[in-house]
Amino acid sequence: MTSTRSLLLASCVFLLAGCGVDDHGMILVVDHSYVPAVTVTTSDGITTPDGILWWHGKLIMADEGGRALRVWNHGPDVVTLCDRSLGILEPEDLVVDGEGNLFFTDDTAGGLWEVDRNGHAFVVAGRSKGLFSTEGIALAPSGDILVGDGVRHEVFSVTRDGRVSQFLDANRGITKPESMVYGENGNLYIADNHDDVLYRLTPAKKLERVLENREGFSPETIWFANHVLYITDSKHGKLSRYTPEDGLETMVAFAGKLHDVCGVTTDDQGQLYVSIQDNESDRGYVVKIGHDAAKDVIPLAAQHD
């Protein structure tokens, strides 16, 4: 069943400390080349999505609260790829290879999981291989899957047949490799939302602290597209962009029930999508941040089933 989405315009100067936010939440677009629109809600068949990924015209979602992987294809409902019957508990982040094989992590069940291009779902390497609480994930140039573990404070490399080896050990200082993505020139970006640090790992495995000790900054999910690193911050309710030339810039701020912004991805046209969790109400949203007419503040009104 679809829901009626009502977006009301408001005039307000947004402050992170509060702005007369209503019970339903508010979105402030700082970059006026974008405007938000609610795309998917709990009424469409999701619970509380975390990681999201745009692939071949479809939005793939790690539905953390629903213990499932789901796909939205512009229709009224979503399709479930796999669920808790497989053994997954809280799917976290995901990546897809060039052949359409989907890999994802689970910070509660642990392990690296796969839904292959034929729709067969299985665990590639589980807790028995030392993957206790898997978070960030990235597809390495070698074809192996890099997986961050928040309990062991390490990053592992996993082959397609489930062989696990150490990629970055705990001595490198990353406490919680929450999200990972490759940027330009073979650099791997790693978000640590425990220590509030954005790292960059060069091809020579030199680990650099790109952003740290910044008030109001805690990287949740990172995504690289069009020479820009996009960063969500669920702790402070922000979507930002980073380039070496311009530094860190806030694009969108979220408040109220829309505060906890999680995943981020881009479609083929460069439109942004973010996932939002309202865990108090056990509801979730996917919001498109698209290139349309500029709007300042858009509070989300009631969601009518």
What are these regions (language model features)?
Residues L16-G18:
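C-terminal motif of bacterial Sec signal peptides marking the signal peptidase cleavage site
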Residues W72-D77, V115-H120, V158-R163, L201-K206, ...:
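Short loop/turn segments that connect beta-strands within beta-propeller blades
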Residues G20-D22:
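Bacterial signal peptide processing site
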Residues G111, L239-S240, S281-V287:
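Structural motif
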Residues S43-H56, S85-E99, S128-D144, N171-N185, ...:
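Beta-rich, blade/repeat-based domains predominating
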Residues P36-S43, V78-R84, H120-R127, V164-A170, ...:
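A short beta-strand motif characteristic of beta-propeller blades
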Residues M1-L8:
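Bacterial N-terminal signal peptides that target proteins for export
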Residues M61-G65, L102-T108, V147-V151, I190-H194, ...:
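Conserved beta-strand positions in repeat-built beta-propeller and related beta-rich domains
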